């Protein structure tokens, strides 16, 4: 397997024989309590609710802030819920322009920090929180 370096753009262009289209990220989570999830993402992280189907059998919401979209499904099928518990070893990283202001907003909303602001050896400054369902979020300075 080839090991690429950060400046491998010319090699990348040779390997990709088809045009590369833009990609965005939407992550899906599977909390038990959609109301708590909506409250957290709207009140604590200032997302806006873009779809609300909590009145349906398969309850679903979609939230958005900037280029980040979060879908949350409360499935009525037990096997689906069990298979999608918060994963260990995964952190969802949200980049912001002002990580200090973001931390201050989170703490002002009364949300506990899993880890306070810290400068990392690899460069960025970040803090960490858990959402109501236990998903681990790292909020960090935007990488340039």
What are these regions (language model features)?
Residues 25, 58, 124-125:
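Short loop/turn microsegments at loop-to-beta-strand junctions
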Residues 78, 121-122, 142-144:
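A short acidic/small-residue loop/turn micro-motif
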Residues 8-38, 90-92, 140-144:
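N-terminal beta-strand motif that seeds the catalytic metal site of vicinal oxygen chelate
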Residues 28-70:
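Core segments of cupin and vicinal oxygen chelate
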Residues 63-66, 129-132, 142:
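Active-site beta-strand termini and strand-to-loop segments that position acidic
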Residues 1-9:
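Extreme N-terminal basic, low-complexity initiation segments
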Residues 32-35, 89-136:
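Vicinal oxygen chelate
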């Amino acid at each position: 397997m080839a090991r690429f370096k950060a400046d491998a753009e010319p090699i990348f262009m040779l390997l990709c024989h088809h045009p590369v289209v833009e990609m965005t990220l939407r992550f899906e989570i599977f909390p038990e309590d959609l109301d708590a999830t909506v409250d957290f993402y709207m009140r604590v992280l200032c997302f806006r609710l873009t779809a609300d189907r909590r009145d349906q059998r398969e309850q679903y919401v979609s939230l958005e802030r900037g280029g980040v979209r979060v879908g949350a499904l409360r499935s009525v099928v037990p096997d689906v819920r069990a298979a999608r518990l918060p994963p260990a070893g995964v952190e969802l990283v949200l980049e912001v322009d002002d990580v200090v202001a973001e931390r201050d907003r989170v703490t002002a909303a009364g949300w506990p920090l899993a880890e306070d602001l810290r400068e990392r050896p690899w460069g960025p400054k970040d803090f960490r929180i858990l959402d109501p369902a236990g998903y681990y979020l790292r909020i960090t300075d935007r990488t340039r």
